[in-house]
């Protein structure tokens, strides 16, 4: 415990983050103004990008909003960008912010329906390969309409539900007991420890298959990933137009990804292949039967309302009746009104998952503003645009893919699409070629970016969620488990981008 006010300040700074991490962030904050003064804004800007990527890579040490936010504020103070430029970036990406605020919250109120659906899938399908394929393909289909973050939130809530049920039983308690700490294994009975570890491995593989599924489906439509909406707005595509332009790349990659999913479960490579222990299956089946028996007529009516809202959501997105985030708000209004969720605090819980990430996204946009103000990516863009036209899509795919592996794909896509749009406005490229480059940018940011958690917004969401520590899903483990998918999806995507247009 701190003994002085000064030690209290140092203890409170970035909370429970390791001391070395706090020291590194302080070092960044000290050297940035010095570099700006001695070496100029160009070098300081690139240094800031490197520091920001570091905070994303260290997401398990400290949520990136805090250190990343401090770096963004400092960038404003030392003149790397301006408040007006940040505001302009936020305004440009306002549809993405609306999506995160309301769509993820809207799906929160559909969790009962989705939990029932995924429970039936999990206890009904006994083959792990078939189950993994079903999870991956279900996540892909859902991501095409709901956005990857939303689907990841659903998969996380399902996994947390299943894990907490068995953890209570393994600790010698009934699964209806409310007061239980799933973060601690201290109360777990020795007899159940091996089954609990095997269950963790089983859930880890399902979570990763599901997360990969969100990338497979998310690349295909304008609402699948936050950056898709951004690209669609810049290019001028509607829902159908976006899908048709992406299909030559997204459809072959989908089939290649599903084949990889099946192969990994059969071969049990890269941490996959964990089976559901029989005692755990019995507990989950009993839980599912008990939940079904306890379901009242009121609960059944609520499930019907959620199903109707899901249909309205899909049609609303397909025909683009309103901005995506506003359709999410419609879902919130419909479900809460017709299921009797009237308490303000109960409604507020729906926004807890999405708002920290929304805040982090605004910090991304501050860094994007620095890149724009200092023209940091202009040399790279100019180099690629100077290549023969036939080579440009492939090079954009590779450049976006490599950057998206170490940085967030929303961040990379925002930068590249706006830079290419400037080239279009300047008359350097035709609109048809601009559309081809937009496909390369979208697929380049969506497919190879599964390599690391900081590449995909949904993966970062998974890594920083409640389920990651419960099933021992660390940054390094995610990278290893994503490797085969990265190779297959990146390879097939690059081939299609260079040969399909």
Swiss-Prot record:
Organism annotation: Marinobacter nauticus (strain ATCC 700491 / DSM 11845 / VT8)
Gene (name only): nhaB
Family according to the record: Belongs to the NhaB Na(+)/H(+) (TC 2.A.34) antiporter family.
GO MF annotation: an example: sodium:proton antiporter activity
Entry function: Na(+)/H(+) antiporter that extrudes sodium in exchange for external protons.
Name this protein carries in UniProt: Na(+)/H(+) antiporter NhaB
One GO location term (cellular component): plasma membrane
Disulfide bonds: none
Catalysed reactions, as listed in the record: 2 Na(+)(in) + 3 H(+)(out) = 2 Na(+)(out) + 3 H(+)(in)
Main location as per UniProt: membrane
Signal peptide location: none
Transmembrane regions: 24-44, 46-66, 90-110, 145-165, 206-226, 239-259, 302-319, 351-371, 395-415, 450-470, 478-498
């Amino acid at each position: 415990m701190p003994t002085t006010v000064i030690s209290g300040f140092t203890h409170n700074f970035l909370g429970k983050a390791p001391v070395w991490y706090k020291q590194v962030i302080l070092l960044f904050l000290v050297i940035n103004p010095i570099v700006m003064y001695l070496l100029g804004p160009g070098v300081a800007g690139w240094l800031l990008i490197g520091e920001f990527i570091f905070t994303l890579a260290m997401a398990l040490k400290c949520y990136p909003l805090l250190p990343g936010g401090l770096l963004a504020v400092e960038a404003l103070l030392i003149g790397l960008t301006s408040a007006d430029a940040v505001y302009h970036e936020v305004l440009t990406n306002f549809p993405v912010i609306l999506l995160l605020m309301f769509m993820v919250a809207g799906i929160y109120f559909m969790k009962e329906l989705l939990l029932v659906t995924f429970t039936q899938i999990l206890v009904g399908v006994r083959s792990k390969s078939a189950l993994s394929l079903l999870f991956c393909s279900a996540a892909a289909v859902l991501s095409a309409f709901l956005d990857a973050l939303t689907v990841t939130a659903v998969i996380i809530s399902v996994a947390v539900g299943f894990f907490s049920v068995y953890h209570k039983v393994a600790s010698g308690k009934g699964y209806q007991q409310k007061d239980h700490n799933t973060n601690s294994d201290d109360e777990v009975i020795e007899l159940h420890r091996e089954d609990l570890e095997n269950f963790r491995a089983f859930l880890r593989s399902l979570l990763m298959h599901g997360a990969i599924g969100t990338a497979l489906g998310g690349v295909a439509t304008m609402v699948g990933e936050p950056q898709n909406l951004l690209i669609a707005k810049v290019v001028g595509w509607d829902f159908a137009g976006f899908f048709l332009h992406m299909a030559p790349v997204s459809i072959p990659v989908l089939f290649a990804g599903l084949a990889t999913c099946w192969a990994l479960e059969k071969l049990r490579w890269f941490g996959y292949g964990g089976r559901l222990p029989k005692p755990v299956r019995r507990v989950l089946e009993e839980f599912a039967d008990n939940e079904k028996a306890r379901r009242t007529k009121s609960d059944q009516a609520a499930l019907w309302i959620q199903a109707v809202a899901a249909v309205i959501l899909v049609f609303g997105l397909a025909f683009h009746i309103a901005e995506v985030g506003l359709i999410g708000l419609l879902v919130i209004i419909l479900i809460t009104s017709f299921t009797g969720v009237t308490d303000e605090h109960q409604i507020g819980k729906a926004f807890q998952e999405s708002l920290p990430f929304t805040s982090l996204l605004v910090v991304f946009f501050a860094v994007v503003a620095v890149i724009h103000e200092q023209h940091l990516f202009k040399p790279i863009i100019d180099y690629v645009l100077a290549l023969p036209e036939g080579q440009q899509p492939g090079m954009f795919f590779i450049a976006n893919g490599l950057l998206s592996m170490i940085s967030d794909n929303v961040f990379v896509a925002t930068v590249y699409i706006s830079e290419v749009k400037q080239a279009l406005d300047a008359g350097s490229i035709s609109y048809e070629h601009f559309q081809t480059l937009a496909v390369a940018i979208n697929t380049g940011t969506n497919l190879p970016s599964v390599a690391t958690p900081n590449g995909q917004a949904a993966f970062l969401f998974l890594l920083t969620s409640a389920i990651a520590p419960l099933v021992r899903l660390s940054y390094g483990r995610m990278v290893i488990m994503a490797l085969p998918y990265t190779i297959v999806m990146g390879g097939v995507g690059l081939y299609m981008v260079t040969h399909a247009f």
